[in-house]
């Protein structure tokens, strides 16, 4: 495997998790979505974002809603700077319990030491990630239920499939896919707990990675949201590409951030994070990485847009 292909391999698989398209982030707080009979106040917050964070929220866009979520992210692995430009998610509500999703992220890699044996000789290069198509399906919603029902988490199923956009990516990751169960407890009006668990596949791996996240979301005001989250991957059948030996690989990571609604249909966000432990690097042992990013969510269209 060439050095360039090795670097692409790291960017698109188990080296940092924030590159997985399906891991695009959960909102730090949930907003009410109006139905056709709901009286709408001018300043009511309608959007429900899946960013920032790496777990995904269980709330589904209602029928007729169209939402765009995009952002910028910068990360550092020893010897390599990574800039995600952009990370973009489109969400389309097709039913009150089903939304369709399309996502793309492109990564600009910049070498600290182009002459290093662990890096390509290029000072920088762009890696297009797979185009991801998916659906989120609401399985259970406790909204409006009794107190006992509210202790049952709102639950959704997220399904994704990724298709490579370039021949270089296709050689090492022809097709990827994921299936995640998304759970959320609304403990109080200002506090919720979300947790996800799922399996993520790629063509090159005989066994899927297991992904798990746990996040706590705070809403101190109607406009401001805060979150802290742990997200982790576990691979019981990883392979060292140099020795061809199998081993168990896992990443334990932490991120935190905030959101601010500047308009009922526009939300800004900022976040940062790092890995607490990486069991093994495919290059030369455990390596830490850190990242930060910011973005915007825009509810482009909803059924009442024309009436406002």
Where are these regions (language model features)?
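In a subset of proteins, long, contiguous C-terminal domains/tails are tracked
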Residues: 6, 15, 294-296
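Bacterial N-terminal signal peptides that target proteins for export
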Residues: 1-7
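Transmembrane beta-barrel domains of Gram-negative outer membranes and organellar outer membranes
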Residues: 22-308
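Hydrophobic residues within membrane-embedded alpha helices
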Residues: 8-10, 46
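Hydrophobic h-region of N-terminal signal peptides that target proteins for export
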Residues: 10-19
